Amino acid sequence: MRIVFAGTPEFAAEHLKALLDSPYEIVAVYTQPDRPAGRGQKLMPSAVKALAVAHDIPVFQPQTLRNADAQAELAALKPDLMVVVAYGLILPQVVLDIPRLGCINSHASLLPRWRGAAPIQRAVEAGDAESGVTVMRMEAGLDTGPMLLKVVTPISAEDTGGTLHDRLAEMGPPAVVQAIAGLADGSLQGEIQDDALATYAHKLNKDEARIDWTHPAVELERLIRAFNPWPVCHSTLDGESVKVLAANLSTGQGAPGEILSASKDGLVVACGDQALSLTRLQLPGGKALSFSDLFNSRREKFAAGKVLGQ
């Protein structure tokens, strides 16, 4: 079977690795154009491109798939199937129709819940009990196609956006390989999604990461986990930015953002309802540290009565 793979970040690269180890032929890889990254803003290839180049697979990086030249280029590959994972470009219907068996997508949620760009983080933020990967047939709508296969994992009280991402990146690739086999032998039939159950996972916005201490502690604790490792929740103290990488629910009352107490166990801050004990922070110019380490060296900075977010 001739497969074209389309994807961009590390999550997608894990899927490509599994396909390279499968019996199927990967005839080409599509990925986003190289982007500036790092302090030097040097153009860097995507994780998928780096993997494809290492395996001598032809790489295509069109700005869009909406023009006739890009579509003709894809059609010339004569693909039986296109596998799409976190690619980042919209595939118009004419592109979806090119492969003999159509296009399938590995999406990091239990569809129809969390269609869209940031399903992993939104699941943690919402306090969902479980997440997973859905392999679906693609159609013109955003993550609306018939579902071929689902794999499920519980979301623990300790899961972050990062830990859930890594777990789903392990679960998704074998599911895709299994789905391809089911498509090839006709044993897998798609299940239509119930649009009434759909929710939308909006793209992450850095502005969302600014902590609003008037919100309930339980919501903020989930947000802090969801946004770790990116974009990382933050607040201000003494006019300086403070990144908050981990927190636990605590008790206590005070003005939102007020420091209620500080000890090696954590920095207890009042919220709109209850309080949070901040256990891992990063100050400007420093690395992320447990609060017990910060407390030993910067005790005066975290005096009770000070207010974060002002």
UniProtKB/Swiss-Prot annotation:
Keyword presence, Phosphoprotein: no
Keyword Transferase tagged: yes
UniProt keyword annotations, A-Z: Protein biosynthesis, Transferase
A single cellular component GO annotation: cytosol
Catalytic activity: L-methionyl-tRNA(fMet) + (6R)-10-formyltetrahydrofolate = N-formyl-L-methionyl-tRNA(fMet) + (6S)-5,6,7,8-tetrahydrofolate + H(+)
Residues that, per the record, bind (6S)-5,6,7,8-tetrahydrofolate: S109, L110, L111, P112
Pfam families listed in its UniProt record: Formyl_trans_C (PF02911), Formyl_trans_N (PF00551)
Molecular function (Gene Ontology), one example: methionyl-tRNA formyltransferase activity
The enzyme's E.C. designation: 2.1.2.9
PROSITE patterns per the UniProt record, alphabetical: GART
InterPro entries linked to this entry: Fmt, Formyl_trans_C, Formyl_trans_C_sf, Formyl_transf_N, Formyl_transf_N_sf, Formyl_transferase-like_C_sf, GART_AS, Met-tRNA-FMT_C
Stated role: Attaches a formyl group to the free amino group of methionyl-tRNA(fMet). The formyl group appears to play a dual role in the initiator identity of N-formylmethionyl-tRNA by promoting its recognition by IF2 and preventing the misappropriation of this tRNA by the elongation apparatus.
Family: Belongs to the Fmt family.
NCBIfam families reported in the protein's UniProt record: fmt (TIGR00460)
Protein name: Methionyl-tRNA formyltransferase
Source organism (scientific name): Pseudomonas putida (strain ATCC 47054 / DSM 6125 / CFBP 8728 / NCIMB 11950 / KT2440)
